[in-house]
Amino acid sequence: MSDLVIETKKLTKIYGEQTAVNSVNLHVKPGRIYGLLGRNGAGKTTIMKMILGLTPITSGEVDVFGQNIKGHEKRIYPRIGAIIEAPGFYPNLTGTENLEIFAKLRGTPQPNAVKNALEVVGLPYKDKKLFSKYSL
C-alpha cells in the first residue's frame, strides 16, 4: 500500500489533436497542502478534474488513498475536496457553515468531518469570520 494520498502515473489528456496534459506524475503526501502553478492553458484544471474523476483520462493512472479510481470515481468523493478556479462559497456565511452545508450535500457521513478538515489546514472550527473576509 502506498503512503501517498494522491499519485498520478503518466496522466495524459488529449482533446482531438490537442494534448492538454502530457504524462504527468504527481506524488501527494498526507498532511501537506499543494497547489498547481502554471500559465493559462497549462492543464492545471484538467489535471484536477481528472484526479477528481470529473474528466475522463486519455491514458495513465490516478490512485487516491492507494486505490486506482478508474471506474470507482464517485467512491472517493466523501474523502476529498478541491477548489478549482473560483470557489463557490456563500460570502455571508462562515467558513465552517459553508463546509457543513457542502458536507451535507455530498452525504459525508462522519459527524466530525468538517472539524477534522479545518484542523488539517490549521483553521479554527466554529470561527465567526465570514467567508467574504478570507484571503484566497
Over which residues does each language-model region extend?
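Conserved ABC transporter NBD signature motif
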Residues: 60-71, 75-76
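Walker A (P-loop) phosphate-binding loop of ABC-type ATPase nucleotide-binding domains
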Residues: 38-43
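Conserved ABC ATPase "signature" region
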Residues: 100, 104, 111-126
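Short coil-to-beta microelement around the adenine-binding A-loop and adjacent beta1/P-loop entry
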Residues: 18-19, 74
